[in-house]
Swiss-Prot record:
rRNA-binding in keyword set: yes
Family membership: Belongs to the universal ribosomal protein uS14 family.
Name assigned to this protein: Small ribosomal subunit protein uS14c
Claim: Lyase is one of the keywords in the record: no
The gene coding this protein: rps14
Keywords: Plastid, Ribonucleoprotein, Ribosomal protein, RNA-binding, rRNA-binding
Disulfide bridges in this chain: none
Organism expressing this protein natively: Aneura mirabilis (Parasitic liverwort)
GO molecular function: rRNA binding; structural constituent of ribosome
One of the protein's GO biological processes: translation
Binding partners and assembly: Part of the 30S ribosomal subunit.
Major location (coarse): plastid
GO cellular component terms, semicolon-separated: plastid; small ribosomal subunit
Family matches, as Gene3D superfamilies: 1.10.287.1480
Length: 100
């Protein structure tokens, strides 16, 4: 299981992303529309002044039960270990073990 501090840090990043996403989107659209180089630099400076952790590229997908950061399935939000356990225990509806 991941450290609690890592899980909390990821939650903080998710909250910051939601808070600043509309402003970030607005500034990016404004950069595309402006033709003056000086204006672009000013808008870029405003974009850089936003918190670093509010960028979506700083987020990492984690298992919502264990907090594991690697080998996650997007559809379930689970790591491969828990997905296997829960599928064998019939806790995930519609999931069957394949055989051919």
């Amino acid at each position: 299981m991941a450290k609690k501090s890592l899980i909390q840090r990821e939650m903080k990043r998710r909250i910051l992303n939601r808070k600043y996403s509309s402003l970030r989107k607005f500034l990016r659209e404004k950069i595309d529309k402006v033709s003056s180089l000086d204006e672009r630099w000013k808008i870029r400076k405003n974009l850089q002044s936003l918190p670093r952790n509010s960028a979506p590229s700083r987020q990492r997908r984690r298992c919502f039960i264990t907090g594991r950061s690697r080998a996650n399935y997007r559809d379930f939000g689970l790591s491969r270990h828990l997905l296997r356990e829960m599928a064998h225990s019939c806790l995930l509806p519609g999931i069957t073990k394949s055989s051919w």
